[in-house]
Amino acid sequence: MTGKEIRAQFFKFFEERGHTVVESSNLIPRNDPTLLFTNAGMNQFKDVFLGLEKRDYVRACSSQKCVRAGGKHNDLENVGRTARHHTFFEMLGNFSFGDYFKKEAIAFAWEFLTKELKLDKDRLYVTVYTDDDEAADIWNRQEGVPLERIYRFGEKDNFWSMGDTGPCGPCTEIFWDNGPGTGCGSPTCEVGCDCDRYMEIWNNVFMQFNRDAQGNLTPLPKPSVDTGMGLERISTVMQGVTSNYDTDLLQGIIKHVEKLSGKRYRQDERDDVSMRVIADHSRAITFLICDGILPSNEGRGYVLRRIMRRAARHAKMLGFAEPALYRIVDAVNTMMGDAYPELLEREEYIKKVIHAEEERFIETLDRGLAILNEEVAALKKEGKSVVPGEVIFKLYDTYGFPVDLTADIVENEGFTIDEDGFALCMERQRLQARENWKGSGEEGLAEIYKTLHGRGIRSAFVGYSEQTAYSAITAILREGAEVAEAVAGEMVEVVVDTTPFYGASGGQAGDTGVISTGSAHLRVVATSKPFPDLTVHRALVTEGTVKAGDAADLRVATEVRGATARNHTATHLLQSALRQVLGEHVKQAGSLVTAERLRFDFTHFSAMTVEELRRVENIVNTYVMDNADVKSLEMAATEAMQSGATALFGEKYGDRVRVVKVGEVSSELCGGTHVRAAGDIGFFKIVGEAGIAAGVRRIEALTGSGALEYVQQLEDEQRSIAVLVKAEGGTALDKVDRLLARQKELQREVEALQARLNASRSADLLAGARETNGIKVLAAKVEMDDPKGLRELADSLKDRLQSGVIVIGCVSAGKANLLVAVTKDLSDRLRAGDIIKSLAPIIGGSGGGKPELAQAGGTKPENLDEALEAAYKIIG
């Protein structure tokens, strides 16, 4: 039975039993900053278990794409070396939200395994939480599992939680006996042994509690069920193999690697590890990029980069000299594209991101090798033969060098590596990374917001049609705590039952404005939305005393709202124009819409040309002049997708969505505020385009009066330039061209004069050359305003000296400058870099360079003569 068939059979089984098949969520957890990546099927249902979200169903099943490569769940270093560790895997799961509980969940699991998949009951074992007599009794009495095949374990093994906080509860696990030939051989080997004989295939978690940051357990509103069965593991059972890498899910990728590398799997263990690493990592890389993560030096992007570099290093070990990982995407998509069609839609984009990162790593690898070679040479001089752990860690962390690659390289030189020192550095990094993640500012929703929401406090938003509202203040917050009142001068957060203020979300800044009561006046400086139905107004009490329960008059700052709306609608038009000009691969990667400007990040692999930018700008302004109506419609999410509306990839939408349409040129899922007609935008002007990450570009633009002021400023600058160059009318450009041509002509004359001057200087300076130990040495101070001229002078002196060492210096802008040049015939004995390192401290500086040329600068010009004289002693 193939992996695809198992997945399909799982869905069919549970759908027939009243479960709704739910699509896998994005690998970036939505509204859950406690998680680095989605790592379990229940992640997308967390708020449902907590009672914060309601769905149209109480039974669900899914096949969730998961990544474990960072934080609490970090399997990266084991991947490729064991039969079961992965960075990417699929988790089959069935869920009950306050519907069925232990009795039904256990029955479903047992029936699916023993009747649908027809597994041998005698090879199945179960575990329960040590105190969960109920689950043990169900297994024994209801399903007929003998007591000797029911094991009890403590909290470490059979009490499940998603993270440090969140839903949790006792669990029961089902194990498959792979047979004595796969185990440790110990006569006491049983379920719970660390060997490969007994393999966990299904975990049923009985969600009864919520664990808070203090570790306290509180009952969930309704007991629920969360189960997880790894598709890779159950595939090994159904296909009669003992390694996940021998299943069809990964063998197709491994065979593709065989074809590209010319090597055979199962012929060399080192090659086998590399092939398994590439097979696993290619899946993780492909899915992570598809879900909107790009390689970077922080957060999720850094984890992706580490995975990519580890895979690229193993590709190099297999003999690939050029980028190869991007060529594995085809095999991944062949295997996974049916279940996850988004892979096929973004295939070219994914390949380009991988190829760009591979090229970057190949360059990094070469730089790392140069550093390692220098370190080995220095250690040899000191008579040492062990590369320090700090050096190994630097190569690993900064240049992506794995430890075994470093060990292989230095072994040829008779060196070993300090593995203990490296392990210590790694542990320090792990501890620091954990602290950085906890303190990154991405903590969960403030507890006070959760408390208010839990009490049923809500805010009805009327801002699409109204910019004023009469309401009642339901809560006042100050410094994270609820208060009864606030007085003038205090900054507070105000919650009302009805508001026209838009809370910041979807890249759009929140509204500003005023709130007035009978006894107070507040200036709203920002508006946020911690929950979809809870709006919080951050405001300064400017006069009087405001109290919870007061009636309030709310007024949005209309000019700010209007400017923001212009920029937001223009952002939609910009995306449409970009796709016309650059292609359908353009996807939104982020945005920021404020009253002042708009910023739009999108997927594209090269800087836009002036012509492309002009075309995009013209298309948007054509849309504006056409003045199409802007309409917003509410509809079912499925209907919106079928209509072709653009959605932000990876965003989680409810069953009902809002679609904003601009004539026939743009249709997007959007909850923001917009103008009524495209003509209200007035004028659109792009003011910047740049790259912000591999495969991501950013455009900044202005609209309306902001765009007009920008153009007027450019005109003012143009007129000022015309005045400066004394140009008449529209001839400024011609005048500047003539000035630049004259400048080049003068520069050539200066260079010719400088060459003659250097020739004259050279003759005079060479007269002062001394011979030291058979080597001609010229050390001299010269008068020179620009130290860049030292190199030209040195070249002239080398030509005349033919064989020797030149040390020249000058004082420029209050600083000392030194240059050392060694003729080629002597560079194997005397290195310019070594000489400059000895001289630089004398002038209060540092320097370096190549064997034949090196430079230094320092803050002690008064010591320049001393440094020049010291050159004779150093060389002698």
Swiss-Prot record:
Cofactor comment text: Binds 1 zinc ion per subunit.
Cofactor: Zn(2+)
Compartments (UniProt record): Cytoplasm
Name the record gives this protein: Alanine--tRNA ligase
Domain notes: Consists of three domains; the N-terminal catalytic domain, the editing domain and the C-terminal C-Ala domain. The editing domain removes incorrectly charged amino acids, while the C-Ala domain, along with tRNA(Ala), serves as a bridge to cooperatively bring together the editing and aminoacylation centers thus stimulating deacylation of misacylated tRNAs.
Any one of the GO CC terms: cytosol
EC number: 6.1.1.7
Major enzyme class: ligase
Name of the coding gene: alaS
Species name: Geotalea uraniireducens (strain Rf4) (Geobacter uraniireducens)
